[in-house]
């Protein structure tokens, strides 16, 4: 919930700035393309908040496409927005490596790119809005170490392994438990952000 509030705050600031830019009567429409990675309830809520905020500003249009966890589909969605000539791209990359080239392409064509929740493998984007996933992983590792009193076997369940939140959380987790030689990571499994 706190994460969603952070995103809402930054998206509100973004739309306020866009609203100021679109105040003139003859101002062209400002087109925003949103390339979501999935269709889960958290993403639906984010999409609803983006659309709700856009309603407050004349001259701003938003089109949202979801890749349904498919890297190829998301790359097609971003190409679609590039070809359409959007003024801003908001992207939550399904997986970092497959999405890096297409995000870099948009950025190099002068389209501002805001990455939300998930990064790519380069710095070719305008802004990132999201959590410090390394710190989250480190905090979990310290919690596990404390709970196990510095000794035991651990199985790590990660999010989608190619996504930056999962990669950064794993790095933070490993950094924390590496301080405890009697804690062993005996297995790691990709849970793909699913609860089951």
Model-inferred region functions:
Residues 2-11:
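Bacterial N-terminal signal peptides that target proteins for export
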Residues 23-196:
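A residue-level marker of the well-folded mature domains of exported/periplasmic proteins
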Residues 12-17:
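Hydrophobic helical h-region of N-terminal Sec-dependent signal peptides
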């Amino acid at each position: 919930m706190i994460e969603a509030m952070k995103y809402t705050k930054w998206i509100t600031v973004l739309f306020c700035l866009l609203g100021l830019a679109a105040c003139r009567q003859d101002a062209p429409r400002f087109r925003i393309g949103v390339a979501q990675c999935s269709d889960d309830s958290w993403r639906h809520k984010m999409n609803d908040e983006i659309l709700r905020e856009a309603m407050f500003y004349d001259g701003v249009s938003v089109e949202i496409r979801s890749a349904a966890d498919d890297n190829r589909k998301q790359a097609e969605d971003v190409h679609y927005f590039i070809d359409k000539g959007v003024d801003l791209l908001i992207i939550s990359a399904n997986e970092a490596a497959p999405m890096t080239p297409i995000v870099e392409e948009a950025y190099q064509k002068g389209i501002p790119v805001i990455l939300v929740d998930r990064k790519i493998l380069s710095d070719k984007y305008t802004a990132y809005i999201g959590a410090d996933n390394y710190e989250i992983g480190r905090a979990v590792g310290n919690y596990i170490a404390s709970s196990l009193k510095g000794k035991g076997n651990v199985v790590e369940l990660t999010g989608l392994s190619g996504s930056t939140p999962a990669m950064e959380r794993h790095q933070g987790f490993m950094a924390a438990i590496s301080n405890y030689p009697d804690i062993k990571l005996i297995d790691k499994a990709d849970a793909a952000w699913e609860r089951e």
